[in-house]
Amino acid sequence: MAKLIFLFATLALFVLLANASIQTTVIEVDEEEDNQLWRCQRQFLQHQRLRACQRFIHRRAQFGGQPDELEDEVEDDNDDENQPRRPALRQCCNQLRQVDRPCVCPVLRQAAQQVLQRQIIQGPQQLRRLFDAARNLPNICNIPNIGACPFRAWP
């Protein structure tokens, strides 16, 4: 009988330890996710909220078209007169290449959401084009190892 009680006590201790380690793992994953989100938010702000990408996304949402048709779109938000004015798509791609790979899709989602908040989007077709443009920018800009971003059209 004493052996049976000892066996059950040992088994209960193992279950308790396994449960505690599972909870610790979950907490560590949550902290890691929070750090990743914070790092991506910092990069979004550091790269001027990807204004060139926002401009490109906005034009694609409103007018559709292929990226090469919008290549001549010039970034208007250029306050520094010493910097040459460059097409919005090219400037967007340059900004995206400076973002850490794990943050590319999160910052593009933020850029699309900012366009959605600031601009008048008329109907579901423009909304779909807006998020399609943001989702496909890594492919358009040839960002290695990213492909299309996995977010959906509804923020």
UniProtKB/Swiss-Prot annotation:
Pfam families according to UniProt: Tryp_alpha_amyl
Cystine pairings recorded for this chain: C40-C103, C53-C92, C93-C141, C105-C149
Membrane-crossing segments per the record: none
Region named Disordered: 64-86
Biased composition (Acidic residues): 68-81
Protein's name in the database: Sweet protein mabinlin-2
Function: Heat stable 2S seed storage protein having sweetness-inducing activity.
SUPFAM superfamilies (alphabetical): Bifunctional inhibitor/lipid-transfer protein/seed storage 2S albumin
Entry-annotated residues carrying Pyrrolidone carboxylic acid: Q36, Q83
Residues spanning the signal sequence: 1-20
Keywords: Disulfide bond, Pyrrolidone carboxylic acid, Seed storage protein, Signal, Storage protein, Taste-modifying protein
Subunit structure: Heterodimer of a small A and a large B chain linked by disulfide bonds.
Keyword Transcription regulation: no
Gene3D superfamilies reported for this sequence: Plant lipid-transfer and hydrophobic proteins (1.10.110.10)
Protein family according to the UniProt entry: Belongs to the 2S seed storage albumins family.
A GO MF label: nutrient reservoir activity
Prosequence residues removed at maturation: 21-35, 69-82, 155
Organism: Capparis masaikai
